[in-house]
Amino acid sequence: YDGNYAAPEQGLDFSHISLTNLNTSIDSILYQGKEINAHIKEFFVEERSGLKVSALAGNVRSDHEQIDVPDLLLQTPNSEVRLTATIPWSSLEDHPQGSMKALLNASLGKEDLLIAAGSLPEDFKKAYPDKPLAITAGVEGNLSSIRITQGDIMLPGAFQMNVTGSMESVTDSIRRTGEIQLKARSGNLDFLLAMLPASQRDQFAIPAGIQLKGEATVANQEYRTELVLTQDKGKVGLTARYNPVKLA
């Protein structure tokens, strides 16, 4: 797939996808309207960037009432992503009734993250922690009301982050309301200094134990955010709002 005439970027470039060595095994296939049943046994593919999918296995089932993904597992030589979901068709309707549930657990290895990031300084690639980035994300609800039940991101020794929140009238840009809470704490972030020229790195220091708390809200077509960053006795606050209607 080539989305434009520019040369492919280094790393994973979604405008230039080139797949090779595709090998898959799927049995028990049924597709008739909303009735779907597929058992994925094997899947292997390589992408131009160096990213490899070494396994994709699991079941996908659907009937007239809901879609079930009891346990879908995707693996690369360095990463693992697991998805469990139950999605009633009624939760996707204009006037939703049912409630979907989805939980994603991911462990993303350094090698795959650097491929996805594209062009980066070589010193940064070496300095980035050789530990997996752990992600847990869970949602419940429908297009009328949805809630983040779990939202955790952690790079061991470097940082951890927690996100919770909810939104009402998800697809209605006028009546939409919602709020998201954010909490984060840093550990050792010295590897970020490797993004700077070597001659400038000694001029900066990133302290450990930085805490970030914040909230973002939307109501009456206005978006607001409040963030507070603290470290030891220091504190920095940010308050912002954006109303596209008033700017029109």
Residue ranges and their predicted role:
Residues 104-109, 116-119, 128, 133, ...:
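Long, compositionally biased, intrinsically disordered segments
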Residues 51, 193-197, 240:
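Outer-membrane beta-barrel translocator domains and adjoining extracellular loop/strand segments
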Residues 7, 38-41, 117-120, 194-198:
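Short Pro/Gly-enriched beta-strand edge/turn motifs at strand-loop
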Residues 1-3, 17-32, 54-65, 71-74, ...:
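Extended lipid/amphipathic-ligand handling interfaces
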Residues 9-11, 121-125, 198-202:
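Extracellular loop and loop/strand-boundary signature of outer-membrane beta-barrel proteins
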Residues 1-6, 39-45, 72, 107-109, ...:
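Generic short beta-strand segments
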